[in-house]
A protein has these predicted regions:
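Catalytic beta/alpha-barrel core
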Residues: 10-13, 32-45, 54-107, 113-119, ...
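Alpha-helix-loop-beta-strand connector modules within alpha/beta enzyme cores
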Residues: 47-65, 90-102, 130-153, 192-199, ...
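Active-site mouth loops of central-metabolism enzymes
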Residues: 4-20, 96-98, 153, 209-218, ...
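Glycine-rich phosphate/dinucleotide-binding loop and adjoining beta-alpha-beta core of small-molecule
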Residues: 250-302
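Glycine-rich phosphate-binding active-site loops on the catalytic face of alpha/beta enzymes
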Residues: 78-89, 116-129, 159-198, 236-244
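N-terminal beta-loop-helix "entrance" segment that forms/cooperates
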Residues: 43-51, 242-259
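N-terminal glycine-rich anion-binding loops that anchor highly charged ligand groups
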Residues: 25-31, 231-244
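Catalytic cores of alpha/beta
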Residues: 22, 61-76, 80, 100-111, ...
């Protein structure tokens, strides 16, 4: 199974002009799977739709209806829901299911490749579908192993909520309203790229280096970034001082103010789930106080 965080897009329930082209772009940009949910569709319409894609593209598709067509057209998965809960004879593709509480997750987890849990946030596409869980409930479910890499978050998912979703232990995120509200925007492609990049970075441990900046790259944050990269991490930095040095000597340093150091740590913490911190040069008492305050504020792992 894909070790990266999964990004899944569900189609809108109705047919849209230009939908095939949009889906092809989504698949080319690297979404994990496309879930095809068209509850009112007729079989000829679904056949026409599936015939519009290559075999490789259909392998990334998961059907919510017409499971026999999934077999016939080589789709990669089928998704159980209140309408359809059968498994075609001889089916060996992916199998997924929608869940709406923790009891369902525990009951179905062993039988499926992955499960959707909804609604994590207030729905964007469905009025009246409010979030069903508190943050504390999701944290507890993660700690108890109920939410794990085989459970994907659905409901109100947007790019700026992914860090929170992945911090709760979800193995993927399921988009619907957020994606389709942007499909005709000139920034659609860049937004999808940002979503996928966020998912990729969530899989790579983010390590924060708090240290001086060495223009020769032999020490300081520059050296730390190389080391972090070499062990498979993603390096983040908060510079405590600008140093005037080379590989032979340090001539002098210019301390960064307490507030500026704190602001650096704050902005990276807003964007990334920091998994470790490496502390180097802290040239003044102010910089020591800034780091102590940041460690207390953001609860970085030991």
């Amino acid at each position: 199974f894909n070790p990266l965080k999964a990004i899944i897009v569900i189609t809108e329930p109705f047919w849209r002009v230009g939908e095939v082209e949009v889906i092809r772009v989504l698949l080319q940009l690297g979404i994990t799977y496309l879930h095809v949910r068209k509850p009112q569709a007729k079989e000829p319409e679904m056949r026409t739709f599936l015939s519009s894609f290559s075999a490789d593209e259909r392998e990334k598709m998961v059907l919510h209806d017409f499971f026999d067509l999934a077999q016939e057209y080589g789709c990669g998965g089928i998704h159980h829901n209140s309408r359809n809960q059968t498994i075609p004879l001889g089916w060996n593709g992916r199998l997924s299911r929608s869940c709406h509480n923790f009891l369902e997750l525990k009951s179905y987890k062993a039988a499926y490749d992955y499960l959707f849990l909804s609604s994590i946030f207030d729905s964007i596409s469905k009025e009246g579908y409010s979030c069903a869980f508190t943050a504390d409930e999701l944290d507890k479910a993660h700690q108890e192993g109920i939410i794990d890499k085989s459970v994907y978050a659905l409901g109100g998912i947007t790019q700026d909520r992914l860090a929170e979703v992945f911090a709760w232990g979800f193995g993927g995120a399921v988009f619907l309203g957020d994606i389709w509200s942007r499909w005709d925007s000139p920034y659609f492609v860049s937004y999808i790229q940002s979503v996928i990049k966020t998912a990729q970075l969530a899989t790579i441990p983010s390590i924060l280096s708090i240290a001086g900046s060495d223009p020769s790259s032999g020490a300081g944050v520059q050296a730390d970034l190389k080391t972090i990269s070499s062990i498979g991490g993603y390096g983040l930095t908060a510079i405590s001082a600008l140093t005037i040095q080379n590989t032979q000597r340090v001539e002098r340093f210019i301390p960064i103010s307490k507030n500026d150091l704190l602001d650096q740590i704050r902005v990276v913490s807003e964007d990334f789930s920091v998994k470790g911190v490496k502390i180097g040069m802290l040239p003044t008492l102010d910089s020591v106080e800034a780091v102590v305050e940041a460690l207390q504020t953001y609860s970085f792992p030991n």
